[in-house]
């Protein structure tokens, strides 16, 4: 009641800004994933009209590694944030 001791209220505009920022982050991550895995796995000459088995396997592994790495980095950053070491704090 009266905003004492409760969680602060977030306006609709703040929610929209947060959603847009999250969408931008996810879109950026997706574009980075596509760029990296495409340049690593897809032959530049495009000799076949379809993705080869070798390219598909490479793409599968590349995407899996990318997401595994993101999870590991996220967990590490969360631990640093909880311990106060994130952003140069010790």
Swiss-Prot record:
InterPro entries: Tim10-like, Tim10-like_dom_sf. A motif (Twin CX3C motif) lies at residues 37-62. The keyword Mitochondrion applies. GO terms for cellular component: mitochondrial inner membrane. Gene3D superfamilies: Mitochondrial import inner membrane translocase subunit tim13 like domains. One of its GO terms (molecular function) is metal ion binding. Its main location: mitochondrion. It is found in: Mitochondrion inner membrane. SUPFAM superfamilies: Tim10-like (SSF144122). Keywords: Chaperone, Disulfide bond, Membrane, Metal-binding, Mitochondrion, Mitochondrion inner membrane, Protein transport, Translocation, Transport, Zinc. It is a peripheral membrane protein. Transmembrane segments: none annotated. GO terms for biological process: protein insertion into mitochondrial inner membrane. Disulfide bonds join 37-62, 41-58. The keyword DNA repair does not apply. Heterohexamer; composed of 3 copies of TIM9 and 3 copies of TIM10, named soluble 70 kDa complex. Associates directly with the TIM22 complex, whose core is composed of TIM22 and TIM54. Interacts with the transmembrane regions of multi-pass transmembrane proteins in transit. Belongs to the small Tim family. Mitochondrial intermembrane chaperone that participates in the import and insertion of multi-pass transmembrane proteins into the mitochondrial inner membrane. Also required for the transfer of beta-barrel precursors from the TOM complex to the sorting and assembly machinery (SAM complex) of the outer membrane. Acts as a chaperone-like protein that protects the hydrophobic precursors from aggregation and guide them through the mitochondrial intermembrane space. The twin CX3C motif contains 4 conserved Cys residues that form 2 disulfide bonds in the mitochondrial intermembrane space. However, during the transit of TIM10 from cytoplasm into mitochondrion, the Cys residues probably coordinate zinc, thereby preventing folding and allowing its transfer across mitochondrial outer membrane. This is Mitochondrial import inner membrane translocase subunit Tim10. The lineage of its organism: Eukaryota, Fungi, Dikarya, Ascomycota, Saccharomycotina.
